[in-house]
Structure formats: structure tokens, C-alpha cells
Amino acid sequence: YGAVSNSFTLSFQRQTAVLSLRTLSRNLGIFFLSALVSSFFLIGCSGTQHDSSANDFDDVQLSDKTVSEEDVQAQNQQIDVENREALIEEAKAKLQLTEDYRDDFIHGEKGADFQKYIVLHDTEGSNDASSVVNGWEASGNLVAAHFIVNTDGSIVQCVPMDKIAHHAGFGDTGHNIDFGVEDESRDDKAGTVPIGGNFADYGMNSYSIGIEMVHVGGSGDYPSAQLEALDNLITYIDAFYGFQSEIIDHKTWRTGNSDTSAEFSTHLQNYKATRKHFA
């Protein structure tokens, strides 16, 4: 009986162990299957959430980027304005400039879109700039340049740069077209009456700044103080408009004029090349 009992007990234990192993295996399979399904579900949800978050992030980034570009553009424009104003003030500070505006010398509006030339003249007299301006006004001819540069380097401005002054007069026939200054409509003197038949074109005034230098042709070279002042004045004009205008002398526009004088010819070539009176 003991042997049978032991055999039965051992058999029962074996069956129980097998059953337990089967149960455990089945339970483990169910567990792992559940875990696997849960993992896929979580990954899917996480991916969806990630995609949604990524899209939200991209939207935020795109929005921020757009705003940032607008801000930067506005800031750069402000910087450009401030830099230009600073350059104008810096250039102007180097001048011994007296502003003595005379309304009678203004002949219309001249915005930056119409600025093309800086025309250099000689006064053909020894009077200082203030006397020259007063003489122009007294003559009643309403002729004037924007600036007059004294031999000591001081400067008088009698016409604002954004206004037309009558300093160049009539040019050679065809020069309006040759110089690209055809539109005379802004000038209160249209230039339809030629002088002697040779000078039918009057457009240069509408597209230029006129600078007179106190000088008499044949009297010798221009003083260094005057030339240095002219250098600085041209720099100021360039800064005011934000670009460089072509530099010519009066006789380039109208042949037969004496200005600028022969002693200025080397300086003129240097101005055209370097915008300074020296090479």
C-alpha cells in the first residue's frame, strides 16, 4: 500500500506540475500577447500624439519664423533710415555751412527720383558767397545755384536740395535727350525759348544740384581749403540722396561757357573718378 500510495502521489504531483506548467505557459502567452497589443496601441497613440505635437510645433515655428522675418525686415528698414540719417548728419557736421534760403530762387520740386547730376560752376568774381547770393537776388533774374563755396572753405546754401534752382541755363541742342533730362514739366520755366538758336534745351536744372565756387578763371589754382570743402560737400549730397550723382562742369552742359576754368580740369577728372579733388 505504501508503494502504491507513493507511486500515486508521485504521479499526481507530476500531473499537477504539468498542469501548472501548461497553465503558466498559457497565462504567459496571454500576458505577452496582451502586452504586445498594448505596446502597439501605446506606440500608435504616441506616434499620433507626436505627429500632432510635431505639427503644432511646426505651426508655431512657422508662425514665429514669419513674424520674425517681418520684425527683422522692419528693424532693418529702421536701421537703414537711422544709418542714412546718421551719415547725413555726420557729413553735414564736416561743413562750415550757412543756410540762407531765398524763396525767389526756387523753381519747382526736385525729388530724389529726378536727381542725376552735380554741376560745378565758377562765380567768375572775387566776391564772397553771401555777396554773390545778394547780387543774384538784386538782379531779379531769379538765377542761383544751390551752394556757393568760398575760398576759405565756408559754404552758403540758398536753395534746398529738393528744389529746382536755375543754375545751368539752356544746354546745347539735343542735350536734354543726351543727358536724360527730358522732363521740364516740374520747372516753372519750361525752356521753350532758345537762346540764339543754339541752346534750346533747359532740362538740366530739373535733374541737378548746382555748386558755385568763388573763383576767377586764370587767377591760379583753387585754394586747398575750398577744394576740401567741395569734397565734403559732394559727400554730403551723396549721403542726402543715398546715391552718387554724376559730376560735370557747366561747359559740359553748354559749350562756350568758361566754367569751370582750365586750372580745374585735373580736379574735375579726379572728381569723376574718385569724388575727391586729388587722385
PLM feature segments, named:
Residues 1, 13-15:
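Low-complexity, intrinsically disordered or signal/transmembrane-proximal segments
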Residues 88-110, 117-241:
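Active-site-adjacent loop/helix surface patches within enzyme catalytic domains
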Residues 8-12:
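N-terminal, positively charged topogenic segments adjacent to a membrane insertion site
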Residues 1-2, 7:
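N-terminal targeting leaders characterized by basic, low-complexity, disordered sequences
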Residues 20-32:
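Bacterial N-terminal signal peptides that target proteins for export
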Residues 45-88, 199-210, 214-279:
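Basic/polar, cationic surfaces and motifs that engage anionic cell-wall
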Residues 33-38:
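Hydrophobic membrane-insertion alpha-helices, especially the h-region
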